[in-house]
Design a protein with these regions (language model features):
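Exposed alpha-helical structural elements
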Residues: 1, 17-20, 35-38, 46-58, ...
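Internal, active-site/partner-interface "lid" segment
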Residues: 1-43
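Acidic-enriched, low-complexity/disordered segments with a strong bias for Aspartate over Glutamate
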Residues: 6-11, 17, 32-34, 50, ...
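Electropositive nucleic-acid-contacting surfaces
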Residues: 29-77
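Gly/His-enriched, cation/cofactor- and phosphate-binding structural elements
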Residues: 60-168
Length: 168
């Protein structure tokens, strides 16, 4: 199940089990690779089932946490003519935005956070016609990525201007 997550293999297992097992193992082992190896060498069907159940609970918690944070801290902005939903967060993935992102209203999602030197920013989209890698390069020439997911950096001054105007 762990390897299916690493390569986004949706065919061999039920994807909800893959995600739940992944989160259950993260909760059990953290990021300790040696512990993961040791645990998996002893794992049996009951252990796998327990990890899936634990992972389901963790995922439910994350969904509720994201929903609350999006409700309190997200805002809409204009990004080079596209409608975006934005939030200051350390959770850099599109699932953070699931409770508020509406493809009928929004073209992209933009998480951002301060890392002590600059603002780290990402763009995500579900729309085929939007190329967020081009938008990331437009925001900062060093930015880029894939058509549906990209990143870039902003200075304090540029971020403050964006936050004041809600436009980029």
């Amino acid at each position: 199940l762990l390897s299916a997550y690493d390569v986004w293999d949706h065919d061999r297992f039920e994807w909800s089990d893959v995600l739940s097992f992944q989160y259950g193992m993260r909760g059990y082992c953290g990021l300790d690779v040696d512990m993961v190896r040791e645990v998996l060498n002893k794992a049996n069907g009951e252990f796998v089932s327990d990890m899936i159940r634990n992972g389901e609970a963790i995922i439910e918690y994350i969904i509720e946490k994201n929903r609350g944070e999006m409700k309190m801290f997200s805002f809409e902005a204009d990004i080079f003519g596209y409608k975006a939903i934005c939030m200051n967060t350390t959770e850099f993935n599109s699932t953070t935005f699931e409770s508020m992102y509406d493809p009928r209203k929004h073209d992209l999602m933009m998480p951002f956070c301060w890392n002590g030197r600059f603002f780290r920013c990402s763009f995500y989209t579900t729309k085929e016609e939007v190329d967020v890698s081009a938008l990331a390069r437009k925001a900062n020439p060093g930015g880029g990525g894939h058509k549906a997911a990209a990143g870039f950096q902003l200075s304090v001054e540029d971020m403050m201007e964006f936050l004041k105007s809600k436009e980029m």
